[in-house]
Amino acid sequence: MSAHTDRSSAVTVLGLGPMGRALATAFLEAGLRTTVWNRTPGRDADLVAKGAVSASSAEEAVAAAPLTVVCVVNYDASDAVLRQDAVTSALKGRTLVNLSADTPARSRDTAEWAGRHGIRYLDGAIMTPATTIGTDDAVFLHSGPEELYREHRPVL
């Protein structure tokens, strides 16, 4: 995540566990319009106080920004949210970055699903503790189309 982001950019974060919260905070501190959503309501109050927009549904959240970052426990959890018809439709033509943990086979399956639905997709992994998110010490791995990564690199 770079401090040299376009201040007019918008990002959505799905999943507000420790890592999702750290990501949303870093996006806010970088000056990005940040929309947040979590399966458990009410986990976003402190982020809203910092300037985040609370979405009432995952569909509303992904429709709010051209870039959605999902960070939940695993692909079963991300699939339960992303593969709902309304959410899948809202993601069409947008970029999805999945930072949830799972197997390479699940990553490939999700990339294929995204492609079938017109969703631009990057898979990722966080290789750092939440306390380093937003600093030069944070380490992320991303895979997918290089041009898509380059497009979003200033934010990621």
Q: What role is predicted for each listed range?
A:
Residues M1-A63, L67-V70, R94:
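NAD(P)+-binding Rossmann beta1-loop-alpha1 motif at the extreme N-terminus of oxidoreductases
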Residues A24-A26, V48, A80-R83, R108-E112, ...:
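Short amphipathic alpha-helical segments
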Residues R43-A45, S78, T131-G134:
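A short acidic, helix-capping loop that chelates divalent metal ions and anchors anionic groups
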Residues A49-A55, S78-V81, L122-G124:
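Short gly/ser/thr-rich secondary-structure transition/capping motifs
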Residues E59-C71, Y75-R120:
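Rossmann-fold NAD(P) dinucleotide-binding segment
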Residues A101-L156:
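Rossmann-fold dinucleotide-binding core
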